[in-house]
């Protein structure tokens, strides 16, 4: 079985997100050097917000810095330690960090949150499990936001394949989607909007000198918006939870 057909375990994820990253995460927030998806979340999320699978915590910390009331959870103890330490160093009292397995019932009451989001989690599960998780999470929030890799992004798809061929891909099973509307619908979530973001970020998966980069640079020079062409790295799906 290929390493790329298996989901990473807790220890493998902990190698990506741990206290060694503290200064880097804090610097991102202090210098306003956050990812395009963290920026996008500040445009969407208001009120009480829950992040499921917070990883480095950068998105939750950025939302907290921008005045949101945030709860962040992860099943990796090292991730939780990292985000708690970063929040303390940034003096952010409006972010709560919880160690919790998101594949099980969550320790919240129904509709406790205005927004629930995951960015970079659901792509590591097969479709049936994605739907089960969405259905479970939806009971705790009013709106659901999903950000997963975009299967229509040519630079991301080619770059990922190149890394798999070279044995340098680090994230195990990762299933991009052209659309996530059906999964939302089957989970009882009414889709309100779907689009892509991060076309520039998608090109980071490619070698620095690659003809696909040159092709997309020409498109941009000619006035094309690559996100409008569904070439963003992340597929953003927003929906209203029933109940």
Model-derived segments and their meaning:
Residues 1-110, 115-119, 134:
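Conserved N-terminal segment of class I S-adenosyl-L-methionine
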Residues 68, 142, 189:
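Short phosphate-binding/catalytic loops that engage adenosine nucleotides
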Residues 97, 193-243:
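A C-terminal cap/extension of S-adenosyl-L-methionine-dependent methyltransferases
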Residues 123, 149-151, 196:
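Histidine-centered beta-alpha loop that forms part of the nucleotide-sugar donor binding/catalytic region
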Residues 125-136:
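A short, conserved alpha-helix within the catalytic core of class I
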Residues 141-149:
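Conserved beta-strand signature within the Rossmann-like core of class I S-adenosyl-L-methionine
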Residues 149-171:
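Short, glycine-/aromatic-enriched active-site segment of Class I SAM-dependent methyltransferases
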Residues 171-188:
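Short alpha-helix
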């Amino acid at each position: 079985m290929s390493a790329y057909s298996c989901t990473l375990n807790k220890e493998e994820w902990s190698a990506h997100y741990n206290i060694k990253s503290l200064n880097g995460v804090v610097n991102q927030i202090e210098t306003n050097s956050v990812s395009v998806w963290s920026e996008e979340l500040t445009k969407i999320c208001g009120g009480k917000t829950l992040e499921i699978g917070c990883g480095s915590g950068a998105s939750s910390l950025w939302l907290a810095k921008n005045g949101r009331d945030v709860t962040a959870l992860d099943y990796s103890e090292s991730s939780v330690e990292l985000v708690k330490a970063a929040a303390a160093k940034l003096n952010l009292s409006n972010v709560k960090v919880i160690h919790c397995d998101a594949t099980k019932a969550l320790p919240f009451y129904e509709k406790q949150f205005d927004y629930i989001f995951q960015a970079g989690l659901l792509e590591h599960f097969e479709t049936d499990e994605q739907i089960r998780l969405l259905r479970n999470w939806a009971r705790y929030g009013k709106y659901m936001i999903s950000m997963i890799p975009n299967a229509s992004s040519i630079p991301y798809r080619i770059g990922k394949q190149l890394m798999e061929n070279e044995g340098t891909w680090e994230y195990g099973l990762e299933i991009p989607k052209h659309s996530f509307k059906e999964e939302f619908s089957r989970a009882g979530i009414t889709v309100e909007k779907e689009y892509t973001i991060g076309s520039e970020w998608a090109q980071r998966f490619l070698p620095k000198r690659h003809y696909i980069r040159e092709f997309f640079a020409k498109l941009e020079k000619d006035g094309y918006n690559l996100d409008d062409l569904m070439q963003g790295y992340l597929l953003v799906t927003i929906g209203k939870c029933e109940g």
